[in-house]
């Protein structure tokens, strides 16, 4: 996928759901995977010509896995002139050594979001961008129907009153195959997950 096509899909979502307002400071949550890195490029490109001026920062919550090297992402953010924060945590130690969780995904997500939101507030951001694409939204809806008997999926924009942050999902119109194509074309520096249960649990 070309950058121009990615920007078109991103702007469509941003405009339709009024995701960005003048003066916003948006934190881009970076996991190291293809989705979040593609979104970083998309918002960086959008920032250059979008009529409403906004600031971008990037952040990764380091869960504490050994050999989780974030230097390629640091280099990318430096190249794009985007401030980048690595928020260290003991989440891995707590989940796998203290609590010895056999299915840690739900608790991990809650702890990670807690650490992320606190750090984002410290950074002075008022919004956080998540890289959920169209396939994620459809998959979440199907899993909700199968396991909970109801239709539920991510909202394009959600205000979190407890933290006074707004979550936006500017990649909601982008297909995963296009994300893969963009990652390959632009050789994004994907950092592989070190989680021992990655790929072995349902969403």
Where are these regions (language model features)?
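The feature marks non-catalytic terminal segments
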Residues: 188-203
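Short, flexible loop segments at boundaries between secondary-structure elements
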Residues: 153-178
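Short gly/pro/ser/thr-enriched loop/turn and capping motifs at secondary-structure boundaries
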Residues: 136-137, 160, 198-199
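ATP-dependent adenylation/nucleotidyltransferase module used to activate substrates
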Residues: 1-141, 147-150, 155-156, 177-185
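Short, cationic motifs built from Arg/Lys/His that form the positively charged side of catalytic pockets
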Residues: 112-113, 169, 176, 203
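Residues at structural and domain junctions
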Residues: 102, 168-169, 196
């Amino acid at each position: 996928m070309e950058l121009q096509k990615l920007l078109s899909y991103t702007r469509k979502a941003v405009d339709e759901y009024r995701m960005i307002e003048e003066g916003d400071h948006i934190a881009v949550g970076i996991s190291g995977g293809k989705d979040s890195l593609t979104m970083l490029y998309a918002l960086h490109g959008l920032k250059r010509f979008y009529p409403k001026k906004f600031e971008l920062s990037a952040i990764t919550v380091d869960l504490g896995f050994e050999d989780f090297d974030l230097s390629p992402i640091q280099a990318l953010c430096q190249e794009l002139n985007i401030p980048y924060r690595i928020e260290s945590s003991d989440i891995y130690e707590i989940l796998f050594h203290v609590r010895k969780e056999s299915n840690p995904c739900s608790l991990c997500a809650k702890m990670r979001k807690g650490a992320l939101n606190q750090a984002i507030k410290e950074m002075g951001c008022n919004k956080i961008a998540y890289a959920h694409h169209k396939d994620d939204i459809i998959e979440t809806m199907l899993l909700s129907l199968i396991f909970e008997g109801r239709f539920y999926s991510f909202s394009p924009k959600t205000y979190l009153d407890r933290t006074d942050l707004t979550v936006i999902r500017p990649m909601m119109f982008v297909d995963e195959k296009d994300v893969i194509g963009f990652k390959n074309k632009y050789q994004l520096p994907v950092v592989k997950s070190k989680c021992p249960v990655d790929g072995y649990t349902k969403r």
